[in-house]
Amino acid sequence: MIKVKICGITNLEDALLAVDAGADALGFVFCEASPRSVTPEQAASIIRQLPPFIQTIGLFVNEPLAVINQTADACGLDIVQLHGEEAPQFCAGVKRRVIKALRVRDESSLEPMTSYRVSAFLLDAWSPSAHGGTGRTFNWDIAAGAAAKNRIVLAGGLTADNIAAAIRKVHPYGVDVSSGVEAAPGKKDAVKIREFIRIAKETRSESTR
């Protein structure tokens, strides 16, 4: 069954709502430019109150390696997601499993994948002004080609209206949603979360990676 990550968690209420709806993982954004940004202290407080078996993922953009590792330790993060221009050797220095995000403009955007040794790749829509959370989709044919050879987490403009088509097209290991289940930036919508996860979990995918 496909894995679902709800990203941009900023408060305990939304975190528990996502867990109760069936989310496999929660994402915390450690990037001050984002309207969904949290401090390590805020994230740690939420994570301490989560039930077991829920994966916690920290999103970073071009932060120093020491800051990433310190934050991961302080918050008890399970996985680190890197959304900037972090090089393969940088990723190797992270003391957690790593998901490397790539912003997809065309097929050439995936060429760096062969150089990385990471747990998974997250594919998001390319934007000249943001490293994620834009609400934009991209060419899923490109993602499908990548998913045939790699463990892929699909992101970018996903909503309850298009998630079934996305899963059937790409066959990803997991899907990642943030703005698609929000009432406002940083505040989740209960109905949207439940519907998104329900449809994602009910949609048949051939992915078993």
Curated annotation (Swiss-Prot):
Enzyme Commission identifier(s): 5.3.1.24
InterPro entries named in the record: Aldolase_TIM, PRAI_dom, RibuloseP-bd_barrel, TrpF_fam
GO biological process: one example: L-tryptophan biosynthetic process
Coiled-coil portions: none
Catalysed transformations (reactions): N-(5-phospho-beta-D-ribosyl)anthranilate = 1-(2-carboxyphenylamino)-1-deoxy-D-ribulose 5-phosphate
Amino-acid biosynthesis found in the keyword field: yes
Sorted UniProt keywords: Amino-acid biosynthesis, Aromatic amino acid biosynthesis, Isomerase, Tryptophan biosynthesis
Pathway entry: Amino-acid biosynthesis; L-tryptophan biosynthesis; L-tryptophan from chorismate: step 3/5
GO MF: phosphoribosylanthranilate isomerase activity
Keyword Ligase attributed: no
Gene3D superfamilies for this protein: Aldolase class I
Family indicated by similarity: Belongs to the TrpF family.
NCBIfam families: PRK01222.1-4 (NF002298)
Name of this protein: N-(5'-phosphoribosyl)anthranilate isomerase
Record organism: Pelobacter propionicus (strain DSM 2379 / NBRC 103807 / OttBd1)
